[in-house]
C-alpha cells in the first residue's frame, strides 16, 4: 500500500528578511548571546512547554517589527493567554522581566528558542508524500525554526522520484527502502509520519529502529513506541470534532436564549 496519505532587534531591524533576522538572532553562538551565563532551568512543566511555541511565534513577529521591550500584558495578548500564566511560564526560564519596563524582547526570544532546542538545527525525515506530506515538506516554518528536511520517503512508484521544493531546494522522494542509509548519513532524530493508519505503526518501528527518537504523527492511530521515544499526535479529524462540540454548545445556548425571549 502506498504510504501517501492524501488529504485534500532592537531600535532598527537590519535590511534583511524577517526570517533571516530572527534566524541570526536565535542561532547566535552561546558565547555571543546577551547574558550568556543565564541558565535555562530544567524541569519545565509539559503545559508550559506547549505554550512556549506561542510566545516564540509572537516574539518573532515583534522582533521583525523592531520591538525592543515588551510587557507581559502585550505578549500575553499576542499569545492568547493571561498575563499571570505567561509570567509563571517565563519564570521557569529564569526570566522575570523588569517591573514597569517589561522584557527585553530579543533576549526573551533567545531564551525561549534555547529552551525549545531551536538554537541548533535538527534533521527531519518525512514518510508519506501525498498531499499532506507535500504540504508539510513545503512549510517554510520548518526551515525558519531550524528544522531541515533531509529526506522524503514513500512506497508508491508514482511518488518515488518526484521532486519537491523544500526550503528553497529540490528534494527527491526516495523509496522507503533507502531510509536506513539516509538516516545513517544524516543522523536525523525526528521523523514525521504522514501515512495512512494501516502503515503508521510499521513506519514508526522502522524510524525508531534507525535512530529516530521523536515522532510527529499525523496518522489517526496511537503508536506503540519504546521508552525514550517521544510522540506528538496531530489528528485533524479529532480537532474538527472538538470544534463541532463547541458549535453545538453555542447553538444550544442561542436556542435557549431565543426561547426565553
Where are these regions (language model features)?
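Extreme N-terminal segment that seeds HTH/winged-HTH DNA-binding domains in transcriptional regulators
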Residues: 2, 11-68
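Short secondary-structure boundary segments
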Residues: 195, 218-220
Amino acid at each position: 500500500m502506498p504510504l501517501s496519505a492524501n488529504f485534500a532587534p532592537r531600535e532598527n531591524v537590519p535590511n534583511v528578511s524577517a526570517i533571516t533576522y530572527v534566524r541570526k538572532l536565535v542561532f547566535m553562538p552561546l558565547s555571543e548571546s546577551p547574558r550568556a551565563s543565564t541558565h535555562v532551568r530544567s524541569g519545565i512543566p509539559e503545559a508550559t512547554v506547549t505554550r512556549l511555541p506561542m510566545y516564540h511565534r509572537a516574539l518573532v513577529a515583534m522582533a521583525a517589527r523592531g520591538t525592543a521591550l515588551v510587557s507581559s500584558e502585550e505578549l500575553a495578548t499576542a499569545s492568547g493567554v493571561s498575563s499571570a500564566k505567561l509570567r509563571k511560564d517565563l519564570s521557569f526560564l529564569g526570566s522575570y522581566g523588569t517591573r514597569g519596563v517589561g522584557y527585553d524582547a530579543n533576549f526573551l526570544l533567545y531564551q525561549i528558542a534555547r529552551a525549545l532546542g531551536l538554537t541548533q538545527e535538527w534533521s527531519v525525515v518525512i514518510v508519506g508524500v501525498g498531499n499532506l506530506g507535500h504540504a508539510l515538506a513545503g512549510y517554510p516554518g520548518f526551515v525558519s525554526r531550524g528544522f531541515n528536511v533531509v529526506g522524503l520517503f514513500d512506497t508508491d512508484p508514482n511518488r518515488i522520484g518526484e521532486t519537491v521544493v523544500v526550503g528553497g531546494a529540490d528534494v527527491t522522494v526516495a523509496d522507503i527502502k533507502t531510509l536506513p542509509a539516509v538516516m545513517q548519513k544524516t543522523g536525523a532524530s525526528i521523523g514525521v509520519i504522514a501515512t495512512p493508519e494501516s502503515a503508521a505503526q510499521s513506519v514508526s518501528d522502522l524510524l525508531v529502529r534507525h535512530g529516530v527518537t521523536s515522532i510527529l504523527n499525523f496518522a489517526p492511530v496511537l503508536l506503540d513506541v519504546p521508552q525514550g521515544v517521544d510522540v506528538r499526535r496531530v489528528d485533524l479529524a479529532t480537532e474538527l470534532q472538538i470544534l463541532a462540540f463547541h458549535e453545538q454548545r453555542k447553538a444550544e445556548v442561542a436556542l435557549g436564549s431565543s426561547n426565553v425571549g
